[in-house]
Amino acid sequence: GFSSIFHLFHSHSKIVRKVLVRFDYAGIAILIIGSCYPPYYYYFYCKFNFAIGYMVFITVYGLTVFGVMMAPQFDKPKYMKIKGILFLVFGISAGIAMIQINLFTETIGSFENEPHLKEWYFGGLSYILGAVIYILRIPERFKPGTFCLIGNSHNIFHFMVLLGFGLHFYGSIKAYNYRLDNACM
């Protein structure tokens, strides 16, 4: 919602753009927080203390990112890379649970036992890749002025966030169905 409002009204005036761009990035932080809850909930359903721990962690980090995105002092162009790095670390930290999943289960290198993990992995990679593209300003750094309207790193970042969210959503539906058939042992 926030991103749609920003992209619809950002050319209204400088002040409107300045305020709405904060909501644009802050909304992405909220979206990422929300897309991490189902994987944590369903995967750690039988070890719910882990689920709660990961949910608290991602919420605290995500709200920190939200706060930075909303802070007027970070509006300056010199902080653009720092904001991108915050999103990169956000994507990486959201995937910390995947390390535990691989270390403590029999799913290492295989998605057969837990088919929804594939979507969660690739959703996380999509978040991370989007942040890297945003930080490196690809493709506009190679052809300045060519990608002002469409195809710039900001657009690609949004696309990668939506792709990651969609993959997490699809994986969560698969995990829900998996949980219906596979109760805790």
Which residue ranges define each predicted feature?
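Multi-pass alpha-helical transmembrane bundles in non-GPCR membrane proteins
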Residues: 1-185
